[in-house]
């Protein structure tokens, strides 16, 4: 299995420190946390169950739909974009290597073991990594960190003393965005609506009075 990791390092395009952290930490067991520079930790993300994270395919589709132009840009957009670029490249190389192993490894048991290892261990780490950076770009890093802390507190609290439902990340920024975007229109829209709605009534009442 160490040879498998070594093949991953060789085949992975890792020109940045972020991607090097991701690969080297898995190979030699170095105490490197790819989330620390963003204010989170591997332990903090580990509170989220494995089935919480979407599949790699869904996460890649999301990243492509939302940030494809920025990811393909030669310019530096943000550390999250850089981390996403390298994670996507490494995942593509990993899939190429896994396909090669599946084709050339004659022993079915060994082949299934490799596939299972990739999907269970490395697949989960990539899902966590992709989810974290996509969420930070979508909702903001502070909101994501706040959510991770809130979920960690919730999951460690005994069921009798915690709310029945876990915190939901999507509800945090939506309330903020709605308030910020809704204040100015709500202050501006009532007066025209009242004027528009009152003017026909006045006209109708005046016409009725004239008719009487």
Curated annotation (Swiss-Prot):
The sequence repeats are at 184-190, 191-198, 199-206
Task: Locate the region Disordered.
Answer: 165-212
State the organism of origin: Hepatitis B virus genotype D subtype ayw (isolate Italy/CI/1992)
Q: Where is the composition biased (Basic residues)?
A: 178-205
| Annotated SUPFAM superfamilies | Hepatitis B viral capsid (hbcag)
What does UniProt give as the signal peptide span? 1-19
Q: Where is this site: Cleavage?
A: 183-184
Q: Where in the cell is it found?
A: Secreted; Host nucleus
Keyword entries, A-Z: Disulfide bond, Host nucleus, Host-virus interaction, Repeat, Secreted, Signal, Viral immunoevasion
Q: Which GO terms describe its biological process?
A: microtubule-dependent intracellular transport of viral material towards nucleus; symbiont entry into host cell; viral penetration into host nucleus
| Subunit description | Homodimerizes.
Q: Which residues form the propeptide?
A: 184-212
Gene Ontology terms, MF aspect: DNA binding; RNA binding; structural molecule activity
Q: How is it modified after translation?
A: Phosphorylated. Cleaved by host furin.
- What is its biological role? May regulate immune response to the intracellular capsid in acting as a T-cell tolerogen, by having an immunoregulatory effect which prevents destruction of infected cells by cytotoxic T-cells. This immune regulation may predispose to chronicity during perinatal infections and prevent severe liver injury during adult infections.
Q: Which residues form a coiled coil?
A: none
* Annotated InterPro entries: Hepatitis_B_virus_capsid_N, Hepatitis_core, Viral_capsid_core_dom_sf_HBV
Q: What is its main location?
A: secreted
* Annotated protein name in UniProt: External core antigen
